[in-house]
């Protein structure tokens, strides 16, 4: 087994990899090469996560679309099953019949 050197990614004592240090490019002076490297790293990270994000967006969109269609379908179903107006007509006929009965009874 080789002895770890200063350029190794894992610290020999703790066994942990060093973390990348966060920098603010607006405060710290960076060379154009460093800025270009940052852009390349960001682009690579974006391209790496793009398929997963696209898949999640598609699944979310399909889920929302299915929910909308389910609500829409249920609304049509419940309206077609509704007998509300029929009940009102029956009550109105009964009220007219009672009114005629009272009028003829007096």
From Swiss-Prot:
Residues 78-104 form a coiled coil. One of its GO terms (biological process) is positive regulation of mitochondrial translation. Residues 2-57 are mitochondrial matrix. Residues 79-106 are mitochondrial intermembrane. Keywords: Acetylation, Coiled coil, Membrane, Mitochondrion, Mitochondrion inner membrane, Transmembrane, Transmembrane helix. It is a single-pass membrane protein. It is found in: Mitochondrion inner membrane. Residues 1-25 are annotated as: Disordered. One of its GO terms (cellular component) is mitochondrial inner membrane. The chain crosses the membrane at residues 58-78. The modification N-acetylalanine is found at residue 2. Belongs to the COA3 family. PANTHER family: CYTOCHROME C OXIDASE ASSEMBLY FACTOR 3 HOMOLOG, MITOCHONDRIAL, CYTOCHROME C OXIDASE ASSEMBLY FACTOR 3, MITOCHONDRIAL. Core component of the MITRAC (mitochondrial translation regulation assembly intermediate of cytochrome c oxidase complex) complex, that regulates cytochrome c oxidase assembly. MITRAC complexes regulate both translation of mitochondrial encoded components and assembly of nuclear-encoded components imported in mitochondrion. Required for efficient translation of MT-CO1 and mitochondrial respiratory chain complex IV assembly. Along with COX14, core component of the MITRAC (mitochondrial translation regulation assembly intermediate of cytochrome c oxidase complex) complex. Interacts with MT-CO1/COX1, SMIM20, SURF1 and TIMM21. This is Cytochrome c oxidase assembly factor 3 homolog, mitochondrial. The lineage of its organism: Eukaryota, Metazoa, Chordata, Craniata, Vertebrata. The gene is COA3.
């Amino acid at each position: 087994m080789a002895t770890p050197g200063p350029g190794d990614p894992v610290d020999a004592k703790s066994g942990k990899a060093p973390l990348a240090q966060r920098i603010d490019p607006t405060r710290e002076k960076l060379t154009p090469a460093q800025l270009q490297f940052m852009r390349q790293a960001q682009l690579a990270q974006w391209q790496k996560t793009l398929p997963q994000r696209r898949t999640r967006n598609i699944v979310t969109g399909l889920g929302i679309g299915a929910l909308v269609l389910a609500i829409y379908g249920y609304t049509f179903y419940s309206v077609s099953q509704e007998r509300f107006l029929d009940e009102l007509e029956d009550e109105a006929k009964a009220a007219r019949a009672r009114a005629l009965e009272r009028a003829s009874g007096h």
